[in-house]
Curated annotation (Swiss-Prot):
Organism this protein belongs to: Magnetococcus marinus (strain ATCC BAA-1437 / JCM 17883 / MC-1)
Gene3D superfamilies given in the database record: Ribosomal protein L6, alpha-beta domain
GO cellular component, one term: cytosolic large ribosomal subunit
Keyword presence, RNA-binding: yes
Entry keyword annotation includes Transmembrane: no
Biological function: This protein binds to the 23S rRNA, and is important in its secondary structure. It is located near the subunit interface in the base of the L7/L12 stalk, and near the tRNA binding site of the peptidyltransferase center.
Name of the protein in question: Large ribosomal subunit protein uL6
Lineage: Bacteria, Pseudomonadati, Pseudomonadota, Alphaproteobacteria, Magnetococcales
Subunit composition and interactions: Part of the 50S ribosomal subunit.
GO biological process: cytoplasmic translation
């Protein structure tokens, strides 16, 4: 039994959820998301709640149960409230700026790094070192933030680089003579 899969997904007002077999479409004020689920997963909508069930008893089916429920919940929350992540830049001369749909990063390279934001995402920069990325698709948001961070991940000696706000970076001691 999946503890997460047993919980029903509550659909708030303003979100239109359409279930067509294994294809689920959520439409809200922020956008529209469509996802194809595994054929072992079934959905039952009762009013403002959606219950996720699994048809098989094998290990793969039961492992997909909680995942499918969480993915459905992320779709509903995303189109109604949206998600956001914050990245901070640490280092002398490291800064960021938004120009249209492009995030321009100065990360110590001989050239600026230009990152084109995917559709459905928007970024704002505060104090030149704090980037806030917002969107309604949690997967696209996480992937975009991981790509931004991958240009200059935090290094363990001085801590310079791009990191998530609140991320702990293990610091190392320098070489001793």
């Amino acid at each position: 039994m999946s503890r997460i899969g047993k919980k029903p997904v509550v659909v708030p007002d303003g979100v239109d959820l359409k279930i067509n077999g294994t294809v689920v479409t959520a439409k809200g004020k922020l956008g529209e998301l469509t996802r194809q689920f595994h054929e072992a997963i079934t959905f039952a909508q009762e009013g403002k709640e959606v219950n996720v069930a699994v048809s098989g008893t094998d290990k793969k089916s039961s492992s997909l149960w909680g995942l499918s429920r969480t993915l459905l919940d992320n779709m509903v929350v995303g189109v109604s409230q949206g998600f956001s992540k914050q990245l901070e830049i640490q280092g002398v001369g490291y800064r960021a700026a938004v120009k249209g749909r492009t995030l321009e990063l100065s990360l110590g390279f001989s050239h600026p790094v230009n990152y084109e934001l995917p559709n459905g995402l928007e970024a704002t920069v505060e104090k030149n070192t704090l980037i806030t990325v917002k969107g309604y698709d949690k997967e696209v948001l996480g992937q975009a933030c991981a790509e931004i961070r991958s240009w200059r991940p935090p290094e363990p000696y001085k801590g310079k680089g791009v990191r998530y706000v609140g991320e702990f970076v293990l610091r190392k001691e320098g070489k001793k003579k």
